[in-house]
Amino acid sequence: MDGFAGSLDDSISAASTSDVQDRLSALESRVQQQEDEITVLKAALADVLRRLAISEDHVASVKKSMPSKGQPSLREAISMSCITNGSGISRKQNHTSSVSIARKETLSSAAKSGTEKKKEKPQGQREKKEDSHSNDQSPQIRASPSPQPSSQPLQINRQTPESKSSAPIKSIKRPPTAEKSHNSWENSDDSRNKLMKTVSTSKLISKVIKNADKHKDVIVNQAKMSTREKNSQEGEYIKMFMRGRPITMFIPSDVDNYDDIRTELPPEKLKLEWVYGYRGKDCRANVYLLPTGEIVYFIASVVVLFNYEERTQRHYLGHTDCVRCLAVHPDKIRIATGQIAGVDKDGRPLQPHVRVWDSVSLTTLHVIGLGTFERGVGCLDFSKADSGVHLCVIDDSNEHMLTVWDWQKKSKIAEIKTTNEVVLAVEFHPTDANTIITCGKSHIFFWTWSGNSLTRKQGIFGKYEKPKFVQCLAFLGNGDVLTGDSGGVMLIWSKTMVEPPPGKGPKGVYQINRQIKAHDGSVFTLCQMRNGMLLTGGGKDRKIILWDHDLNLEREIEVPDQYGTIRAVAEGRAEQFLVGTSRNFILRGTFNDGFQIEVQGHRDELWGLATHPFKDLLLTCAQDRQVCMWNSVEHRLEWTRLVDEPGHCADFHPSGTVVAIGTHSGRWFVLDAETRDLVSIHTDGNEQLSVMRYSVDGTLLAVGSHDNFIYLYTVLENGRKYSRYGKCTGHSSYITHLDWSPDNKHIMSNSGDYEILYWDIENGCKLIRNRSDCKDIDWTTYTCVLGFQVFGVWPEGSDGTDINALVRSHNRRVIAVADDFCKVHLFQYPCSKAKAPSHKYSAHSSHVTNVSFTHNDSHLISTGGKDMSIIQWKLVEKLPVPQNEVITDASVTKTPASSSETARPSNSPPLPPSLPLTGTAEEESRMGSSPTLVENSLEQIAEPSEEQSEWGSEDLGVVIDEEPASELSETQGATELPEEERGITPLC
């Protein structure tokens, strides 16, 4: 204890009453001494407040006498707000006296008052207008930042000028304990210094805030920011807050006045051009051939119409989340697609629904089921006997509600609970308009529909083995029902017209009259062909079998193992047929010639993306261990290679000859970009590698890891030889992004705890303590999500994980951002104002994991995480069109077109924009937007105008912190699925 020399034996102390009394006396003396110190402290504090008031009065008078924008008051008031977070400094200008509150090495540093001499201003540091003005009456104000410790990347040290009479005091870094012992109480100035280090800042803050009330009109725009993201400016830096943590970003020297910076919408926009991939992993019966020669299927929230002969795609873009099922109208033109529930950009739920749309014009005809379905739409079917007037739907609720709709009137006719077990299919009988059949786990139900009532009759298996799953339905020419089950058996159900014995059930019950062993493993899909023959697809055996009119096996063919098991079979042109597989392939084949791949994609979560430095190529890698090279002009796969580890990140060498791929285990591979041969393999740590980045000349490679280190390698022979150069150590969390300087001497990096650190690579990969030294570096690439040039892309109230990737275009005009809310954003570059506006686009149905521009900035590539999609966007520019130009749609209100889009750099004619739907319900109006033509962009019609940011309304106080809805399981009781379905988890 203080006040005692040495230590006392506990037994003697306890036994001696006199020692206890001595201790109490010493404690009383110390308490009295501390009370005296507090009294002196209060006096010093009063003096500090008096000096602050005088300084503010002087600044106010200077403001009135000079034609300025109130910069001194703005900086002064915001600096005070920085003190409240323990991370700022106060800078005053006074010809009589001034107070400097300077940062030390800890966040709770105190301030020194009044006697320090002015410091020399470092070369390149900018002077303020008010500084030069006050120089007429007082010494020139100068500032000198001091180095920062790596463990406190958000701290800023700044020395401020004092009066002419102040004595020189050196700025020396020392531990707080040493500094405390160095100070003395011999004079009033030193006494105040000591007291300012021990005083609680809360009372000072309250006084400072009161004194700053006069500046409320100046800082109102800053004050409206939420406490979770509050920008503050003092001289040379901007500070934003994320989850309560301050992030400091130094302003480049070429910014003369931060208040003059304006961030607007970029003239460039995005138009969806191509979608790579297909969702077959956890869906069924979702591939069909239309009379237009197009294959219709879906992935993410996009329904794709692909003409495999002309190699063109069109896209229906009306859905707001995962599309889960698809049905084609008997006229083969109209299509119904169902989606799951989702959330909008503000976290509000988007209800599951069915959209009926025209496959020729891509216009939405009707939106059905808003507020009716729960979780999602599992399966649906158009009626056939009455030419498709009605639509039946099974939702994903626990009761799996069956509803029948007059879809043209959007009216629900009948509704009933089916079962708590999984329902896999629903179909109208093709000749009996009043019969609906559902099947699923251990059941098949025959429903009689009459008016607004539905009556259920359960199929009885009797002497036949009851299957675990009845997986699919089809109808024979005589009206019999054909089912395929998990045992590989086809059952024929015939409707008996014999009057049953009393009490044995009603007339017209479906009974089994024949059983056929069709496949080893499950019968996954049935397809009735136009000529009356039947195609079946097996699960485990991967066979496509053709059956004649009497259900005798005629021909068969096996799908190669690398494509996976069969999920969908559809009739194609002539003798062709289409097959969708569990590994997300769509194959076109015949029994004579075998199979040809038409569509393919990744089959597990996708993160890695890199674009070629000078060719129209892009590379992706995913958790499925596939590395794929795509041609962005011909829209096809160049090559694919299976590696030993799940891939997570990638980057091309500037020569374009090799590409580096980082994996989840710390290993990284270098592959030849032409031959896909393995060039090199290395290991750095045993955790996930999050970023690979070559320097601009390709002589160095930086590898960012989840073990908090950045590993540096020298690169020789155009990327074919690597040797360890060094390691950057200093981050307190995993590396997320990094960028190189043009001279290869510096790296900027971000980490999982929102650090922005800079590294001196030339001098041994050392951490640069004085981060302001790097504020003027023009980075070769910009992929870091935190930095002065890009911090405006962050939403208010962000938890720091909302943005997964960011990339600046090569021409430095725009920034593309991938977020956790299924959106791709396009911002202007630089983006240095909070809540900057952006163009926003929807097509993904999962978190968008990565974005990258092609080498000539003609296209942007985005990747979806769990939706496994790769989407190629074309950059276009807006051009005005006549105000009286309108587009007519059966369900769209005539609206003057405000703009059109033409491709940049081509000179194609203007394209008509998409138009909003008319509707009575607000929810339906919001969700009813759909594309009119394929050329339309994906911007949501019912979202706020682009003059407002995606992240909120014009009210800066809005905080958006809701999380997206949790993913829904496709089935309950997945553990009981057939063998070929086990382990398959639904994507949404």
Swiss-Prot record:
GO cellular component, one term: microtubule
Record's compositionally biased regions (Low complexity): 137-155
Phosphotyrosine: residues carrying this PTM: Y237
Domain of life: Eukaryota
CDD domains according to UniProt: TD_EMAP4
Assigned keywords, A-Z: Acetylation, Cell cycle, Cell division, Coiled coil, Cytoplasm, Cytoskeleton, Microtubule, Mitosis, Phosphoprotein, Repeat, WD repeat
InterPro entries per the UniProt record, alphabetical: Beta-prop_EML-like_2nd, Beta-prop_EML_1st, HELP, Quinoprotein_ADH-like_sf, WD40/YVTN_repeat-like_dom_sf, WD40_repeat_dom_sf, WD40_rpt, WD_repeat_EMAP
Segments of this protein annotated with the region Microtubule-binding: 1-260
Composition-biased stretches (Polar residues): 156-168, 890-904, 927-939
Phosphothreonine: residues bearing it: T96, T201, T248, T620
Gene3D superfamilies, sorted: YVTN repeat-like/Quinoprotein amine dehydrogenase
GO biological process: attachment of spindle microtubules to kinetochore; cell division; mitotic metaphase chromosome alignment; negative regulation of microtubule depolymerization
Phosphoserine PTM positions: S7, S13, S16, S61, S79, S134, S144, S146, S171, S200, S906, S908, S914
Subunit structure: Homotrimer; self-association is mediated by the N-terminal coiled coil. Interacts (via WD repeats) with NUDC. Interacts with alpha- and beta-tubulin during mitosis.
Function, in words: Essential for the stability of microtubules (MTs). Essential for the formation of MTs. Required for the organization of the mitotic spindle and for the proper attachment of kinetochores to MTs. Promotes the recruitment of NUDC to the mitotic spindle for mitotic progression.
Name of protein: Echinoderm microtubule-associated protein-like 4
Species this protein is from: Mus musculus (Mouse)
